[in-house]
């Protein structure tokens, strides 16, 4: 079994423009004579590697603690793509995955500097998939991500953003990207990993 950590380190992570940076504060320090070390931290729900719940862009949408965990845990497919993902590209990815492993078609991770278009978002949304992941801090065009988010989240497709797939080849894996159990939250950081039977 081989485990790929596809998460960013939180305090050195990439942050979407305008979002606050993660911060940590040492409240107690054994080095300073305290009995124990104790750290407090503050961060945005969408810092680093994180999931977007429908509530992020859909008024009345599901919060992160209301989403079934099987959306984040199960067979997944890593597809490499660079540039804009067209509707035809999305359809081709889905067709290829369904032939290899129909269960993996429910969770697709896009490797590369891909930008999901509104047209491809509609194709993914219509496929009844659970999760779409990408390496960028936002799944849509960086200067106008709202429409793509609304299409996908409105269809109940959760988003896994800010993953790191440089060490991962295309193919089928087991994904665990469970979010923290944050009541009423529109998103959550997660420690996303891919697992394969190969060593």
What are these regions (language model features)?
Residues 1-199:
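Active-/binding-site microenvironments in catalytic and ligand-binding cores
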